[in-house]
Each structure stands twice: as structure tokens, then as C-alpha cells.
Amino acid sequence: THYALVGTIAASKKYMTKLVVSKGYGLGIFLDTIPGKMQGSEENMPAMLQRCKTGDIAFVKYELSQEVFARLWQYLQEYQEKGYDKLYNGSNQPLNGGGAGCSAFGVSFLEVGGLKDLFPVDDWIIHVHAPEKLIGGPHHPGHHVSPIRLFFRNRWADEKKEPYCDITYYDPTVMFNQIELKYKRGFHANNISGMQTGNAFGFLIKCADRPAPTVPIWPAKR
């Protein structure tokens, strides 16, 4: 029997702050791969139980076949063996070793398990136009962005008026809001039903009859 309650975070919040405040990364902090680490059940379980009490969490639970679970477990082990758990942010493409935030890391399990189509997870994606002049760090060498400029900028780039860089990511707040909204509206399907744990809303997806994908877990490198 295997069990894991894992997530990825930045290895040091102080380091991230330093990159923005002292190194002038600006919005480039969302594009750069920075040191990360994986948190396990001993850290995540108390937080999850507390959030279930307060309702500050939403969830989607999948009932899997043993075959699919074994594939996901293999993915988790190999992800750590490759050292990808130490890469945070970046391109948010964990299967390509490009780094990942917590949300992209979670969704990657749905991709590996062939489960992504069972729930409208693409509704959680956010696309923004980051003004190029507010991007520093490796993506804009030699360009230092003052934190003050970030503080007073309250909008994304106007694509018709200024250069920009596209940033795409799974937004945790959107994930929470979408799941809770669907629950309250009574969203359901043949294999999907709403459920509640404490004061937390979510869904149960019964998909134990779905076979594991036959394609390799890791995409071929080009």
C-alpha cells in the first residue's frame, strides 16, 4: 500500500523576495526556474485537515484502478529521481523538466493518468500579458525592475500598445472558485457527484474502469 500527499513549493521565500527586491526580477520571477522542494504528508496533512474545517479548500477526488495508481506512483518516484522536485516555477511544464508550481504539478498527474478529460480542468488556466518593461532576470538580461514600479502598476499589458510576454498558469484561486461554484450549482455527470468533507466542497469522480495509458510517462526529448 502506498500513500502520498505531496506538493511543491519554493525552497526559500526569502530567496524569492531577494530576487524581486534586490535583483530586480520584477514579473520575471514568474518565468524563471528557482530552487524548489517537495512537501510530504507530514507537512500537508495538518494544513489540509484544518482547511477542511474552515472550508478554505476545495477538491476533486478520483477513484482509480490499481493499474492507473501504479503508473502515477511510478511518475512520482521518477519525478524525484530526476531532480525535478527541486525545480519551481519556470515554464510550468513538469513533464518536460521545465519546473512547476504546485498547481501545474498536480494537474500533471491527471495528464500522466489519462484523466484530464474527466473534469473541466482547463477552466483553471489563466493567460496574462506581462509588460516586457516589468520583466527582469534571465529573461531580460541587464534589465532591473524596481519593486516600486510593480507596486504602482495595476494592470497587465495592452497588447496593442506595448511589448509583452505571455504567462500561462493554473491559478489556485480560480481552481477553488470554479470547484465551489460548480458544487453549489449542482454540477454532476454519470460518474461525477458532489461531496463534502467538513466544510470543504468538492467532487468524487469514479473512474476505476478507465485503463492506464499505454504511452510512455515521459515525452521523448527533442
Enumerate the predicted regions with their spans.
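Generic structural motif recognizing short loop/turn segments at the entrances and edges of beta-strands
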Residues: T1-H2, Y25-L27, G55-V60, P163, ...
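Non-membrane alpha-helical secondary structure
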Residues: K37, L64, V68, Y164-D171
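Active-site-adjacent helix/loop patches that line small-molecule binding or acyl-intermediate pockets
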Residues: L49-E67
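Glycine-rich catalytic cores of cysteine/serine-nucleophile enzymes that process amide/ester linkages
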Residues: T1-Q50, K221-R222
